[in-house]
Amino acid sequence: MDGDNQSENSQFLLLGISESPEQQQILFWMFLSMYLVTVLGNVLIILAISSDSRLHTPMYFFLANLSFTDLFFVTNTIPKMLVNLQSQNKAISYAGCLTQLYFLVSLVTLDNLILAVMAYDRYVAICCPLHYVTAMSPGLCVLLLSLCWGLSVFYGLLLTLLLTRVTFCGPREIHYLFCDMYILLRLACSNTHIIHTVLVATGCFIFLTPLGFMTTSYVRIVRTILQIPSASKKYKAFSTCASHLGVVSLFYGTLAMVYLQPLHTYSMKDSVATVMYAVVTPMMNPFIHSLRNKDMHGALGRVLRRLFQRPK
């Protein structure tokens, strides 16, 4: 009980990835620029989809929710990082750290599950086009998204509650960008074997199951596309999946760089990979999804024209 009280009343120091004032200034402007680009890109995606009735389809419904998740994700971490880079007070309360961790886990999980649902949408559209309207009905889309949210909220709550049973002692200095589960476990002075086992087991289920589902879906999609006789139709089918594959590759690639390693080897060198998945991935997603998408180009153009159109 004393350990719990000690943890509840303590603070952590988010020291970031550099203590050099010159480097901190560079990092501040870099992260601020990336944050603004991320917010602008994802807000434009949401506005374009919501304002264009031609984009009111399951694929764009899930894309808008993915953009919302990415927007929430960077807002959970980057503003605090920017404050720490400009301030001498780098403290974050125990409750604040747990709150940041909860949203971090929940939103990464939600991103992962939405990507899996988007793969299912592409599978039905290409492999079972005659059943697409019934298989991806509005009611089912809302149900799938609700399940994604429910599971993400539960998983974030589970890991956060488990961490409340951990006792922290000694210097509570986090040489990292934000409160991360692996980093916090390294600061613990109580036995973390059970929570580490739960973390690995649930993490494998939550992330590898959707990855396996997406891999299976795309194997079947590729087989179906290769059977299409028309070269132009093949290209169109591949192009509808290319952006999703790009986002999935970036998402899982950066997560693997950070988390597919033993806890005791987790060190400062992983900060670059963390920046990739925590900042770069949400920033790049809008560009990847709209790069070769003519429908998105048109919708974004109409949104921008309305925003900058002078009132008569």
Curated annotation (Swiss-Prot):
Glycan attachment points: 5
Keywords for the protein's UniProt record, in alphabetical order: Cell membrane, Disulfide bond, G-protein coupled receptor, Glycoprotein, Membrane, Olfaction, Receptor, Sensory transduction, Transducer, Transmembrane, Transmembrane helix
Extracellular topology ranges: 1-25, 80-100, 159-196, 261-271
Membrane topology (UniProt): Multi-pass membrane protein
Protein known as: Olfactory receptor 1D5
Record localization: Cell membrane
Pfam families cross-referenced by the UniProt entry: 7tm_4 (PF13853)
Entry-linked PANTHER family: OLFACTORY RECEPTOR
Record has Nucleotidyltransferase as a keyword: no
S-S bridge residues: 97-189
Record GO cellular component, one term: plasma membrane
Source taxon at top rank: Eukaryota
Keyword Protein biosynthesis: no
Main location: membrane
Role of this protein: Odorant receptor.
Cytoplasmic domain ranges by topology: 50-57, 121-140, 221-237, 292-312
TM segment ranges: 26-49, 58-79, 101-120, 141-158, 197-220, 238-260, 272-291
Gene that encodes the chain: OR1D5
GO BP annotation list: signal transduction
Family membership noted in the UniProt record: Belongs to the G-protein coupled receptor 1 family.
Single GO MF annotation: olfactory receptor activity
